[in-house]
Amino acid sequence: MVIQVDTREHKSEWERIQSQFDSLGVQYFRSKLYCGDYQSLDNAKLCIDRKKDLQERCGNVCQQHERFKAELIRAREAGIQLIILCEHGPDIKTVGDVYFWENPRKHKVIWKTVNGKRVKTVISDKAVDGCQLYKSLCTIRDKYGVRFEFCTKEETGRRIVELLS
């Protein structure tokens, strides 16, 4: 198998995955992909879009919604099955696990002294929580035919190879 890697993949992330590919004996080359980050030359209709964690997913769903939606539409119209591989860690193995995820940005508390009194301030109390993100992922899955997979950073290279095989 030869894997095509998008040139826009973040340098430090690519170097980590590149070393995993090297240890697995996977052949690869870099060039711009139509959508996603990884694709096998054996099947141009299957792409993997790697995300570093659920907080990046929140950014795609909320702040970068239009750009992300355009990529989903582009993949669907081209007949490409898009798999989003999220490297969140061992706690999240399925889309269902996302429901119970606690966004650290939502629950971060800072204590300030205001007029001599300690006041609790919640940072980003409007941040997306697991329940909201779960609903968004289910909508994306159902509307655009996207598949969501999860792994740890240590198994990303192996999971990419498995998913593209």
Each model region followed by its residue ranges:
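Non-catalytic C-terminal interaction segments of nucleic acid-processing enzymes
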Residues: 1-43, 56-165
